[in-house]
Amino acid sequence: MKILRQLWNQKGLDAAVEDVPEDRYGFGNIAENISRSILTLPLEASNVVGIEGAWGSGKTSLLNLILRNLALKKDAHTHVLHISPWLSGGSPVEALFLPVATVIQQEMEIRYPPKGFKKLWRKYLLSPEAQKVIEYAQDTSSRVLPLVQYIGQFSSIINWIAGGIKVFSDSRLAVDQKTTTKLRAEIAGQLVSLDLKFIVVMDDLDRLEPSQVAEVFRLVRAVADLPRFTHILCYDRQIITHAVEHALNIEDGSRYLQKIIQLSFKLPRPEAFDLRNEFRQRAEALYQQINNQPPDSGMVRDLIAVTDTYGAALSTPREIHQAINSLIFLYPGMRDFVYFPDLCLLQLIRVTNPALYDWTEHYLTERSVIETGQGMLSDGEKADFREGLIRCMKTFRASNADSFLTLADWIPGISGHNDEYLNLFEPVSEDFRHIQTTGKRLSSLTHWRYYFAFSSPQNVLPPEFFRQLFEQAGVSEKQQQLSELLLSKINSVGSLSGTWFEHILSRLTPGLIRERNFEECAGLVHFFFDHTDEVSTRFSIRNPWFSLREMAINEVVRHLLKHMQDIDETRTITLMEKLIVTGASPFWIADFMRDLIWEHGLAQNAVPSPSDALFSRDITERLRDRFAERMNQPELQQQLLLRKSLLGYLYAWRDMSSGETVKQWVREVTTTDEGLVNLLIRLQTSVFSSHRGAYRRIARDQVSPFFDDWPAVEEKLKVMLSGNELTPEQEALKTALENDD
């Protein structure tokens, strides 16, 4: 906690520069030259100097350095009055004239010490000279206050009488009050005779309400004829111009300012290189303070790329403060879950292009839904995203920052070099996903949410889960715990439409698998060979139209076995020979083995690409023969009619054993009418049609090869299913036979 506090600017989150060592933009030299010029201005009349600059450009910092220079170079008769109407909230007339009256009062007492009765009452009496200033302030102010209230505010010498003694009454002022012109002349004479000079500094005028701005300019005009006054006003010209036009109901506020302000100095904009270089240096320093080590070369390279491209949009020192303060606030709590240059990128965009920041969060939110298979966007929604990005990018001044291709280096799924060819939500490769996840990148489905919400995405499991999953899989004694964990994820709703089990499968990518050792991968393979049939059963209960093929379990197991072979081919083959015989999911194993033999054309099929085969032809034949022996055993054949779907299994059995073996089993189970109906119920296939929706049918071309006389079977079924008292399953079979289209 102490270290985190030290990261902040102890003077404030947006504190201005107060001394030359803090100056990063060359304001010190500017302040020295301006202060020198101010001290040489003519004394015969009032002078008004304007320092102009946009919000956050460093006006207050420059002003602080000017004040420091004035304090060092002015003579004893020059008094600097720093007035902040925005902070005080009081009348600027009071804020100016009460300190002036105080200075005159003190100067008169020094030069003309009171004697006798006046010496006794000097704590309670204003000098005539100070009283003239108060009277002039009353005439100038837009609201008249009792004199005792003025006395109570302006002088530390007589402050204590404010609560009780009323020396001058309102009637006393009314009797002795002079005309404003005469008072001004007398005060001017006093200033000359006392050799007093005043430099009045007013900051943050652009933060005032329009009516307050008008009051400040009325004050400046009121003092315009007084000699020895120099006003330094700091403001954003555009804002002040609009405020004057609104408050005074005039058309051209700029022309009005020209009448009031005799000299104006526009704050030079810092060099773009200086701004982005400062951001990068402070960002690197922050990283080192938090991590106790400097960023590595790759991170430095990415940080330079971010600042050179998106840091070029920085226009004021305040924008740097805002971006760095955000990093100080966010990064310590999320450093283990984000990539620092990506976080810097987001904060730069948030400060310089807030609309793009909001677009990015919305885009990544929707992309997460699409990439995890939980939903999709319509063409209209995609078009809205596209138009939104085009609008956001047009606000960038820097040429590289407005490039879609440049943005695509940081935000995934973007392609196209101009508006016409811009595409969003483009798919990415599994390797890309893994690299981004490993690097904790903004483009990672696992980590993107941390960058916006201090937390992980609610629809994505964190990397820690998968680390623990593999570690558990690598310990044989924990196989039961592993199975319970994974099977429990089938019943847990992890997202809008899927389960955590499906999410886990989608995350078991080749990139993630390549980081694990042999035992860990073998443990997961063991789970699938033992429990995939149970997985299928559980999902079928949840969804009668469920298809195991769509879950990509086969692909995950292939990735695991491929990596295991790369580590130790002999151990992998030995494990496979064991699992195809002992694995408790023979129906899924049949499907997986059919994929393997098709890779080598062992089912009299066309070979897609032998180079993509998981095992060699010899090993595949050996595995096929061993599993065929298991399929031909009565123990397994007795379980077949317990399955809800058998057509795929029969084809796998045919490809690994023989068609005649399968037909012989069919003959045996169809010797009775009940057996025939039970078998055909399990030979239905699911169909999804755009005009009919989901339905089941008996695909005659797929089912008939397993029967000696299919037409005779159909005739028999027609008779059997023609009655009025059919079970729901028989009714479904009758409909399925009619649906063969």
Curated annotation (Swiss-Prot):
Pfam families: KAP_NTPase (PF07693). It comes from the Bacteria. Residues 27-334 form the KAP NTPase domain. Gene3D superfamilies: P-loop containing nucleotide triphosphate hydrolases (3.40.50.300). Keywords: Plasmid. Signal peptide: none annotated. Responsible for the exclusion of phage T7 by plasmid F. Growth of bacteriophage T7 is inhibited in cells of E.coli that carries the plasmid F. This is Phage T7 exclusion protein. It comes from Escherichia coli (strain K12).
